[in-house]
UniProtKB/Swiss-Prot annotation:
This is DNA dC->dU-editing enzyme APOBEC-3G. GO terms for biological process: cytidine deamination; cytidine to uridine editing; defense response to virus; DNA cytosine deamination; innate immune response; negative regulation of single stranded viral RNA replication via double stranded DNA intermediate; negative regulation of viral genome replication; transposable element silencing. It comes from the Eukaryota. InterPro entries: APOBEC/CMP_deaminase_Zn-bd, APOBEC_Cyt_Deaminase, CMP_dCMP_dom, Cytidine_deaminase-like. It comes from Pan troglodytes. Residues 213-215, 313-320 are annotated as: Interaction with DNA. Its cofactor is Zn(2+). The gene is APOBEC3G. Residues 1-60 are annotated as: Essential for cytoplasmic localization. The CMP/dCMP deaminase domain 1 mediates RNA binding, RNA-dependent oligomerization and virion incorporation whereas the CMP/dCMP deaminase domain 2 confers deoxycytidine deaminase activity and substrate sequence specificity. DNA deaminase (cytidine deaminase) which acts as an inhibitor of retrovirus replication and retrotransposon mobility via deaminase-dependent and -independent mechanisms. Exhibits antiviral activity against vif-deficient: HIV-1 and simian immunodeficiency viruses (SIVs) and also against simian foamy virus (SFV).
Length: 384
C-alpha cells in the first residue's frame, strides 16, 4: 500500500516537479496530486507566513487528498488567529476533484476572512458536467467570497521551481509546448467558468472605425451549434472568447494568433463525426493570410463542421491577406462584416455588461456598410 503522505514537505526534486506539473491537458499515470501552498496576511507585499507542500493520491479516501490535508492543518492553525485576514495561494498539479471542490467552497463560505487563489497545472475531468458545475460554484463571486482559479503559466511554474523545488540554483527550463498547453487549458477553463469580457475591452477592440491605431490584439468570440431535426441548437458549454498571445507572453517567443489558438482547442471538444456543427466566430480583425489558410485547411478536413466568421474590421486588406480571405471563402467559410445585430449579440453574450444595454458608437452602421462593400470586392477579386 502506498503511503498517504500525511506530513507536508518543503521542497521536491526537479524530476518530480517536471513529471507531476507537466501541463499537457490529457495525461495518464499521474495519480499523485502535489499542492504547493503559501499563506500570508492580507496586505501589499506581505511575505508568506508559511509555504510548504502537501501530497495525496487521486484515488485515495477524500481525507487523504492534499486539499483536505491543507484545510485540516489550516483549521487548527486558524483557531489561534481568528481575527486575522489571510490570503492563501495554491499551486496544484491537478485541479481539485468534485468533492474537494465542494468542500473548499463550503470552507470559504464559512470563513469570509480567507481568500484563496488556485493556480492549476491541469484540469481534472474537465469534460464532466457535474465537475464543471462544482467549479462554477467554487469560483462564483456574487453570492459571497469564493476562490479564484487560474491556469499556471510560465511565471507560476518559474515561481514554484524557485520556491518549492531543489533547483540547485538552476533556472527553470520550460518543456516543449508549455505555452500551447497553457492556452488550451486557459480556454477550457474560461468555457467552464463562463468568463466574460470587460465592457471597455469589447468597445475598444471591436470598434469598427475604418482606420484605427493601436489595436494590435485580436479578440475572437465563438459559439457552437449542433444540427438537430433540421434546427440549429446552441451548445452552451461550447462558447467563450480569447485573444492572440503577444510575443514573450506566457512563454511564446514569437506569439500566436487568436485564430490558431482557437483551432488548437477544437479537437478537445470531441465533436461527433456523425453530427453536423456550425461554429460562429466574431473577431475584432479578419484573419491574416496564414490564419485564413489554416482555417481553410480545418474546414476542408472536417466536413461535419461549417464555419461562419463575422469581422469587425478588415486586417491589412492588401495582397496576400485578400488572397487568404478568398481561399477561406472558397473552402466553404461564410465571411461577413459585423453589423449592429452582431455587435449587440456579442455584448449580450460575451460581455460582463451588468445589465447595461449595448450602446452603439457613432458611425457604427456607416462603417459596417463601407467595410461590407470592401469585403465583397475582395471576395470577388476586384481589389479596392
Amino acid at each position: 500500500m502506498k503511503p498517504h503522505f500525511r506530513n507536508p514537505v518543503e521542497r521536491m526534486y526537479q524530476d518530480t516537479f517536471s513529471d507531476n506539473f507537466y501541463n499537457r491537458p490529457i495525461l495518464s499515470h499521474r495519480n499523485t496530486v502535489w499542492l504547493c501552498y503559501e499563506v500570508k496576511t492580507k496586505g501589499p507585499s506581505r511575505p508568506p507566513l508559511d509555504a510548504k507542500i502537501f501530497r495525496g493520491q487521486v484515488y485515495s479516501k477524500l481525507k487523504y487528498h492534499p486539499e483536505m490535508r491543507f484545510f485540516h492543518w489550516f483549521s487548527k492553525w486558524r483557531k489561534l488567529h481568528r481575527d486575522q485576514e489571510y490570503e492563501v495561494t495554491w499551486y496544484i498539479s491537478w485541479s481539485p476533484c468534485t468533492k474537494c471542490t465542494r468542500d473548499v467552497a463550503t470552507f470559504l463560505a464559512e470563513d469570509p476572512k480567507v481568500t484563496l487563489t488556485i493556480f492549476v497545472a491541469r484540469l481534472y475531468y474537465f469534460w464532466d458536467p457535474d465537475y464543471q458545475e462544482a467549479l462554477r460554484s467554487l469560483c462564483q463571486k456574487r453570492d459571497g467570497p469564493r476562490a479564484t482559479m487560474k491556469i499556471m503559466n510560465y511565471d507560476e511554474f518559474q515561481h514554484c521551481w524557485s520556491k518549492f523545488v531543489y533547483s540547485q540554483r538552476e533556472l527553470f527550463e520550460p518543456w516543449n509546448n508549455l505555452p500551447k498547453y497553457y492556452i488550451l487549458l486557459h480556454i477550457m477553463l474560461g468555457e467552464i467558468l463562463r468568463h466574460s469580457m470587460d465592457p471597455p475591452t469589447f468597445t475598444s477592440n471591436f470598434n469598427n472605425e475604418l482606420w484605427v491605431r493601436g489595436r494590435h490584439e485580436t479578440y475572437l468570440c465563438y459559439e457552437v451549434e449542433r444540427l438537430h431535426n433540421d434546427t440549429w441548437v446552441l451548445l452552451n458549454q461550447r462558447r467563450g472568447f480569447l485573444c492572440n498571445q503577444a510575443p514573450h507572453k506566457h512563454g511564446f517567443l514569437e506569439g500566436r494568433h487568436a485564430e490558431l489558438c482557437f483551432l488548437d482547442v477544437i479537437p478537445f471538444w470531441k465533436l461527433d463525426l456523425h453530427q453536423d456543427y456550425r461554429v460562429t466566430c466574431f473577431t475584432s480583425w479578419s484573419p491574416c493570410f496564414s490564419c485564413a489558410q489554416e482555417m481553410a485547411k480545418f474546414i476542408s478536413n472536417n466536413k461535419h463542421v461549417s464555419l461562419c466568421i463575422f469581422a469587425a474590421r478588415i486586417y491589412d486588406d492588401q495582397g496576400r491577406c485578400q488572397e487568404g480571405l478568398r481561399t477561406l471563402a472558397k473552402a466553404g467559410a461564410k465571411i461577413s462584416i459585423m453589423t449592429y445585430s452582431e455587435f449587440k449579440h456579442c455584448w449580450d453574450t460575451f460581455v460582463d455588461h451588468q445589465g447595461c444595454p449595448f450602446q452603439p458608437w457613432d458611425g457604427l452602421e456607416e462603417h459596417s456598410q463601407a467595410l461590407s462593400g470592401r469585403l465583397r470586392a475582395i471576395l470577388q477579386n476586384q481589389g479596392n
